[in-house]
Amino acid sequence: MPHPSAPDPDPAPGLVTIGKAAKKASLGGRTQVIVPVSGDAAALSGQVEALASCRADIVEWRADTFLSSLVGAHFVSASDVEEDLARMARYVADSSPLPVLATIRTSVEGGEAYLDDEEYCALVRRLASFAGGVDVEISRDGSSALIDEVHEAGAIVVASFHDFEGTPGDEQLAEVLAAMNYAGADVLKFACMANSATDAARVLAAQAWAHEAYDRPVIGIAMGSSGAPTRLVGSALGSAATFATLPGWEGSAPGQFTVEQVRAVLDIVEASED
């Protein structure tokens, strides 16, 4: 029997469906708005309630921030937190009106989870039992096998790469995207800190190149004040999604706009394309 959040069969070429039935969205066509929720159980409850009135398409649960609320900034064993994580994953999946992308962002890539490769893979596998999509950090040892295991659980995979210090060279970005594609990820995501307008332009160029090179959705983001415009104009270069904040709540990365701000710009861009 398929997982209740498994993607619909045989999506159109280049399209990936996250979720199912009333809770689903397609990546690879119209740019989707992803809104992160984070924090401890009380904060999550308030944010999940607010989802009903926002114009987002997908919710990203930053599970690493929940883990941090339990254990702080310490390396942990998966067995110590697995059941608490599963209970919260079930709550978010059941309560959210939107399809869920579950993410454990590790400290190595700017997140709050301190996990070695084995513990990271164990917890991501567990999340795949609840969420329609799961983020997999491509730089982790065992990421290719983990992608296969997430697929077997019925969830889609957003392979990700983050650099909070700067924007890598064009060749390195191309190698990272090629590795994601080779590993069989459904969606390719990269986010880099833009320390200049030139960095932001290179991220957009990499986004446009990958969109043409690979028959799967690509999400390219330049973080920081110099990169903020890429969150709004990336749709014109084939970006499958952009991340935005719930009004009154903090974002998950530097440079994010609110859902309403992003939606207003996307509406204008899409109207100009009609």
Residue ranges and their predicted role:
Residues M1-G46, A271-D274:
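N-terminal amphipathic alpha-helix/helix-capping segment at the start of soluble metabolic enzymes
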Residues S5-A12, A208-D274:
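C-terminal alpha-helical cap/extension of soluble enzyme domains
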Residues A25-L27, V48-R55, V81-P97, L123-S129, ...:
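Acidic (Asp/Glu)-rich catalytic clusters
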Residues G28-G46, T106-D117, S160-E171:
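Active-site mouth loops of central-metabolism enzymes
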Residues G29-V33, R55-D57, S96-V100, F130-G132, ...:
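Short, well-ordered coil/turn segments that N-cap beta-strands
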Residues P36, I58-F66, T103-R105, F130-S143, ...:
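Catalytic beta/alpha-barrel core
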Residues I58-V92:
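Glycine-rich, proline-tolerant flexible connector loops at the mouths of alpha/beta enzymes
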Residues A93, P99-V136:
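Glycine/small-residue-rich loop that forms an oxyanion/phosphate-binding "nest" at active or ligand-binding sites
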